[in-house]
Amino acid sequence: MTWSTSFLSVHFFAFITTSIHAQLTGSVGPLTSVSDKAAVKTCNVLDYGARSDNTTDVGQPIIDAFADCGSGGLIYIPEGDYLLKNWISLENGSAWAIQLDGVLYRDSSPSSQSYMFEISGGRDFELFSSNATGAIQGSGYLYHRDDTYTGPRMLHISGVSDWSVHDLVLVDSPMFHFVIDGGYNGEVYNMAIRGADHGGLDGIDVYGDNMWIHDIMVTNKDECVTTKTNSHNFLIENIYCNSSGGCAIGSLGSGANVSNIVYRNVYTWDSNQMMMIKSNGGSGDVSNAVFENFIGHGNAYSLDLDSYWSSMDAIDGDGIYYHNITFQNWTGTAVDGETRPPIRVICPEDTPCTEIALVQIDLWVEEGGYDEYICKNAYGSGYCLDSATGTSTPYTTTTYVNSAPTGYEAPTMTDDLATAFGTSASIPIPTIPASFFPGVTPISAVAGSS
């Protein structure tokens, strides 16, 4: 254990040079443009029996339109309010798109845990709003007010390649908002996801290969944008966790397999953590990851790699091997750096972490008089990490810092929520913000913006 009145950051590590470039391996998104798809055929759901009266079911008209346009064409849902009675499951489409300019409202039935809107298989797909006001309203509060958090999930992309989802709003799902299983060459951007202040209402959960997720705002109290196992070559940037659970990798169990992941430009406000990598036992490998340019305010935890995460049951195995992972350029404040250390790197005793880099982590407390940093069985460079190599001797180092680091102060965002949304009343549909990270404009202009 050490005590210091100042803390010296290490600004350069030889082994981070290659890891910082880990991201995409090729092009992402649809193979053909929306205009080309529309030129083949356009299927307006109003021609298939839909009505913008929030009474007539729009689910079956969308399914019927897919029969005509799912092998080449555009399904068009005009502005207006539509009732979603029949859940939508569309499979193995090609060269097709859905333009959702209206708002879909979940009907009170069915009540199963299945997905309200599911796209599986196929390739060259796009789901978007041309005016950035297209939305799905899940009315999850009708479950949550009765303390029920098991129910329908909202949007699911499964086994699709060369695709995108953008300029949409997802609101108040009874359970998970957006799940991506086996997404390949996909792009997700310009979205606002807003859920209740409770666990189990994940924003985006994703696994796959060659994925670009950017310019996303999430409000809930669970996963913001979280990478699951079997994920490779991800670039996740310009993320706004606005009173959320925060971003994460995990939770990870047996046979974990995650590599070449970049999170950058992540802004986290009033959330559970800025970034958490979580496991408890298990096996496998997480490697070649970079977490850079993080800003946080009012969060419970900040930088948290926890291989003994107590919120999941322990899994058989010596632990996941975490290696070649860099955290750099973090600024802002934590609620209480004494009881919840802003730096926590807790690695398995039998499978120590190696090649970990902590670079310019400038975080300070909002309450209390000092920061606490804790590293356990973690080897690399910076802060409380042990620089030794070739050893597996268990260790724990706790460092106390009683003066604020230079440069910890960081900007806030105008859309920061003063209070979270509860669980007993309808959550209003938000506007997609003009920015998702301080001083940075969206990579692609939000639809309909001037």
From Swiss-Prot:
UniProt superkingdom: Eukaryota
Subcellular location: Secreted
Enzyme Commission number(s) of this protein: 3.2.1.-
Enzyme class: hydrolase
GO annotation, biological process: cell wall organization; polysaccharide catabolic process
Gene3D superfamilies: Single-stranded right-handed beta-helix, Pectin lyase-like
Disulfide bonds listed in the record: C43-C69, C224-C241, C347-C353, C375-C384
A molecular function (GO) term: polygalacturonase activity
GO cellular component: extracellular region
Positions glycosylated per UniProt: N54, N92, N131, N242, N257, N324, N329
Segment forming the signal sequence: 1-22
InterPro entries, per database record: Glyco_hydro_28, Pectin_lyas_fold, Pectin_lyase_fold/virulence
UniProt keyword Glycoprotein present: yes
Residues at the catalytic site: D222, H297
Protein keywords: Carbohydrate metabolism, Cell wall biogenesis/degradation, Disulfide bond, Glycoprotein, Glycosidase, Hydrolase, Polysaccharide degradation, Secreted, Signal
Reported function: Pectinolytic enzymes consist of four classes of enzymes: pectine lyase, polygalacturonase, pectin methylesterase and rhamnogalacturonase. Hydrolyzes alpha-D-galacturonopyranosyl-(1,2)-alpha-L-rhamnopyranosyl linkages in the backbone of the hairy regions of pectins.
Recorded family membership: Belongs to the glycosyl hydrolase 28 family.
Protein name: Probable rhamnogalacturonase E
Originating organism: Aspergillus niger
Gene that encodes it: rhgE
